[in-house]
Amino acid sequence: LSYYIDPKDPKESKEESIFFRKDKFNAELSFGAKQIVTHFEEENIAFSALSKLADFETERKLSFYSTTNDPQKVAQENRKTLYPGFNKDRRTYLKSLINKFSEHKILVFEFIETWNKKEKANINGFYLTPSTIVLKRQKSYRREIFTLIHELGHYLLNIEEIDEIIGDDYTTYEGLDKI
């Protein structure tokens, strides 16, 4: 059903239509992860259809960037608009970041995985075009903040298949998932 109500043309890609922050770099998605992704893809399509029917503006407010841009300049530009101000309480800081993102039409959702689920998701977050970020609820707010900012990078680049661009050069950073 969602295929027929989606107003966008089908995207031709060898990979999935989204980019994930997984537990391990270049890992295969588990069945649980695929279920969560499918659920949020359907929610994203439904939201897109409803926003068109309700004349709700979902235009992107932030600029598009590429991997050739100077990362420091990009960070400085976007910090002015997206940085809510630091708060020592990480939960409050995460909430203020999400609120600031919503002011710029970036939707942030969170999924909670129960301890007794048979097929667990092996992703910490993912980005869906045009403006949806999905995070896995973590015990550590620091890790959720890291994943949120990571996915913001994909939003700013507007590139979902970035794995193909960066390749295996970043396998040395596999330990980052321990944060």
Locate predicted features.
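Short juxta-domain linker segments that transition from a proline/glycine-rich
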Residues: 1-179
